[in-house]
A protein has these predicted regions:
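Long, low-complexity N-terminal extensions
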Residues: 1-156
């Protein structure tokens, strides 16, 4: 099982995904709280040393008027994934002339995460995405409720 990065070990785990999950867990924490029709997201702005400047990565990014994404783990991977989420949302808007639905965005992001667990010459993303969906007032009448989602390095 150790000859390939994409081969499951006897216990049913992919070592690369385990390492990516560890990297994600060591990142700056993001807290998301859902209460009634409100979502609160918070994360400390931590600089590990006085000799290191903040990398300038936005911790929270609005993808659509209803969707906000945050990441924890490797900042470089988080930036790439946020840019991909933005691109997917823009392509959907351009193609269908409507904002992307949360389930479609989550599926696209999850597929990308999962693809990188099996892709040759690539490693899984070392970050976790927290996706907050706060639908507009009109969508509440349709039964759409606010929700918080997490996408981990395995794509789950």
């Amino acid at each position: 099982h150790s000859f390939s990065l994409t081969t499951f070990d006897p216990s049913g785990k992919l070592n690369q995904v385990e390492r990516s999950s560890d990297a994600s867990a060591k990142g700056t924490p993001v807290i998301a709280i859902l209460r009634h029709d409100t979502i609160l997201m918070a994360s400390p702005q931590v600089c590990p040393s006085a000799f290191i400047e903040d990398d300038g990565t936005a911790r929270f990014v609005r993808i659509t008027p209803d969707i906000i994404v945050s990441h924890s783990g490797l900042s470089a991977d988080g930036r790439v994934l946020v840019q991909i989420a933005q691109r997917v949302a823009v392509q959907h808007k351009y193609t269908f002339d409507e904002n992307i639905q949360i389930d479609i965005l989550l599926e696209e992001i999850s597929l990308l995460f999962q693809e990188y667990t099996i892709k040759a010459a690539a490693r899984p993303f070392g970050c976790t995405l927290i996706v907050a969906h706060l639908p507009s007032i009109g969508d509440h009448d349709l039964g759409v409720k606010p929700a918080i989602y997490q996408v981990d390095p395995s794509g789950a």
